[in-house]
């Protein structure tokens, strides 16, 4: 925090709060009345009070939007009258005593405060929910909007909107809440209701809640209002039974799935931690609005209701169920980690959230509700891979520890403190640590943490305190070193694997460095390259895990046996570069045997995709290794096992990148076709009739990629004409949607006359596409409108693949006439693949090259388009600005390899006309040049293999 911490500055800290709040949601005044009796004790961390024997005259508490009316303090029978002043900038109430206050070990300083606070009225999702807030909603019986729900949100610094306190996570106290409110309302808080007492008015009552365990102010909470509820009892360890309730303002029957999930997983978590659930009850309160979506208040979890009020028809969707369960169990984990054990700074929020997600996913997977999560696409491809790519793209990237050092103040919201990058890296770190340590060992280590209540519950701690404790318990320094390495070292490593035969023996050498994409020589020299603690997860050629070498802690490691793959199942946060022929030969052997995991093969291709085209990292072995695997899969003697279609599609994505880079060389293009594309095309069993509706979607993706890569082939064109006829004429469900784009591209590429082209051009009209949607096999259940749109976009993208000069002119005229329509620039897509080819007329080659025709068209229209595109604030201007940038990007790519001066001259002339930055042509050109450097790198090593 940027503000001075009261937990360090103040002579006293709270040990107990007794609160009475008077809340009437119906009243027009947006205020509540509050009184607090706060027990204060000597602060051993105080910078202003050396010891308990010293006296003081001033102390402070946080208070935001509170008007303190009066205050006094007592120690035993001694009373201290207090003067109150406000520091509104720092949100402090300052209490001054005329006589010195001398603390005693026997008697606390008891502060009594009367005050008034605000209740915020929340009407939309854009309104921020913090402190106490209320929402009115329609009574479904009367049809009037006079029902109310009042709730709280205290994280990170909004408890001080409810009562004067030290609103910092380092301070843990107990709480006893009393609420005076309308008798018609349900009232829920952290602890059970202990007593309900009628007040003078028969319509009001006082609800007294039991005293809480030690907890931070951020997880204090309550809710009152017109709430429906579901309730059950859950049996826990030791024949203990606790009530669990779900509250919501409406549709409470739709909360049954939430209740069932809590009933299943609360006992499982208690068993996992070997620590009793810390409270005598648990409630979920589902609210119409909640800015942070969910809040793990101790014993009273609040969640925005649309996440957990799930109607039966929605529960049929597996993804909906899994997301709801992840959310519920995540919040349940917090009852132990985050609430019972809490952290002394918001700098640890990443760990608190990462831990809850990691353990929730582990427990759900272990108990059959999140099948194969840690090897699933949502985890590996939607979380791990994008995070690694971002990390490798930033030479100035920060470690988790550095990210967490945020300059937060008392006005900060959770969104200001939470960092998704640190959170995701934290989950990955915990998962890899779990595997490296052993699931049962890590669980026992965590059990030992919860056993030590004096250290881990009586006070707030740091995450590293937990790992130091577990390391000592397991007698392993590697635990602490591992966590320290992954939290304090920025970026991610790449591990190079070299296998060689020496004196009749196999020797494997591993070398690690930090991995950064497109690193210049100067940046490489300045890069901090500290070795990571890398969990190897190695697999031996016999398929067993390598148990001899499990952790790479130094720069290099050598051992005298071969390794098949490391980072098995992609569970580690690093890239692997296989840099020996022997590595790829071994991989191919296991593909033949079908013993190589499909996830491992996909990971090999994913990592190669990061190396290929990277001037500072790519070498010829990466291209050779890719070709060796793809050629092996394409060979007639190798069967493509169904499990390999998915990784093969990733390998072909890398090949498409190489294919795009080789467009300037017919020799390189011929090499790729002959070595991989044609053998793969010949190997695939292409249906000449209807497709099997149960065909693997990944197989269909591979088919689509192979058709596109083989688009110049007459044999491919003949096949696609059959599919194109089925697309236009049927029968029903005869062409997979996944193949439509590639079919259209191949047909367009081989169009010989206007009549043929018009069949494709007709599909540019949405109405024509709508009429053929029933001819398409739709694997992903898009509706007919979505399917028609996809066919239409595919048709537009395919127009530019035709080489007939008359058709090219018609395509360009079509773009010109419709330039103000969304997506028309897509029609240029094909020209970018044929830009070096000669146009033909009546199937006879002409002198003019495609890109020369495109350039004449571009130059003839640019100034007119640019004038319109630079009219800011108009719909046409904004759209044309975007379209013209896209068109310029495509055309610049056609000349960057061999005529860059042409583009540079054009940009300089246009800047004189239009101004320096109206279209940012310099930025577009810089991006194109950067991409070309990557393509040059590919061509450099590709040429050496041809």
UniProtKB/Swiss-Prot annotation:
Keywords: Acetylation, Aminopeptidase, Cytoplasm, Hydrolase, Metal-binding, Metalloprotease, Protease, Ribosome biogenesis, Zinc. Substrate binds at residues 293-297. It is an enzyme of class 3 (hydrolase). Coiled coil: none annotated. It comes from the Eukaryota. The active site is at residue 331. Putative zinc aminopeptidase which may be involved in ribosome biogenesis. It comes from Saccharomyces cerevisiae (strain ATCC 204508 / S288c). Binds 1 zinc ion per subunit. Its cofactor is Zn(2+). InterPro entries: Aminopeptidase_N-like_N, Aminopeptidase_N-like_N_sf, ERAP1-like_C_dom, M1_APN-typ, Peptidase_M1, Peptidase_M1_aminopeptidases, Peptidase_M1_dom, Peptidase_M4/M1_CTD_sf. One of its GO terms (molecular function) is zinc ion binding. One of its GO terms (biological process) is peptide catabolic process. This is Protein TMA108.
